[in-house]
Amino acid sequence: AHSVVSRQEILTLAGKPLAKEQFAGVLDQAGGTLLATVLSMLAPDGVAVAAGLAGGSDLPTTVMPFILRGVSLLGVNSVTQPSVTRAEAWDLWATHATRFPWESVTNMIPLAEAREIAPTVIAGATRGRVVVNVNA
């Protein structure tokens, strides 16, 4: 990834069966309207990987991205995977995740600030991830 796009920015295009092609691939942790919208934004032969449903389990989309752009939607089942498979996945992640500038999408806060930022996180108004350092 070379950039981070905010949820709010993506959701401005919600409801469009096809949007401007912006992504070759997407890893979606939200599901729901956010996943439906990024599907409409995939380039031809693009791939979306669904790995969560924090934004909802429904998928309000059309078949247009699938038949007009040939996009694929893959699901990740982490719940029933054996521990050895999970360990292999985490090892792969650790090997390849160092290539991404995580500091650009991560806000590290001490535990003492968690209550203060919680309403912002719940409202979905943060960009990237908020990591709470319980030792700080």
Description of each model-found segment:
Residues 24-28, 51-52, 78, 103-107:
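Glycine- and other small-residue-rich loops at beta-strand/loop junctions that grip anionic moieties
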Residues 1-33, 91:
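Adenosine-nucleotide cofactor-binding segment
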Residues 9-18, 33-38, 99-112:
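Short, basic, helix/turn surface patches
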